[in-house]
């Protein structure tokens, strides 16, 4: 898959590649939502330090350069609301996401995933997958709403966040075949 743009602007939100300057705001936002995020995200379950934040931003920069992952801050009115990432997989991509508590229920993730799914297909991905713990109903509602199909369950990586069961549900959406060229 080709490299996506660094910024996407939509009505009501912006997706922007993470920058080192985002560190202080990201740190404050994650720490303000630790209970909410830590239930499902192992990286937030034991607290989130300035070093954790700096390491995340370093890793996102390296992964972007290698094409392994393209991570974006979700911004609403200029403020960080959460994150969405597009991870390269053989023949397709996986999309992961999270939001700060105060931004849940606004349709931001559904709209961000819609945008990035369309972009992934435009850039050559054959499929998009979304994985979530089988108990995380909110995360599962996104691919269900967007027409993805459950293709399997699989063991989650260890260690697990406190609310996780250890079983991930995997959803997939295939790129629609291109229409036949005119005159064929």
Walk through the language-model features, giving the residues of each.
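Acyl-donor (CoA/ACP) binding surface of acyl/acetyltransferases
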Residues: 1-25, 29-36, 71-184
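Generic, well-ordered alpha-helical segments
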Residues: 18, 29, 45-52, 66
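Conserved GNAT-fold acetyl-CoA-binding loop/helix
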Residues: 35-58
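A short helix-loop-beta-strand connector motif used in the catalytic cores of GNAT acetyltransferases and
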Residues: 44-47, 58-73
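Short, intrinsically disordered/low-complexity patches at protein termini
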Residues: 48-51, 60-62, 105, 162-164
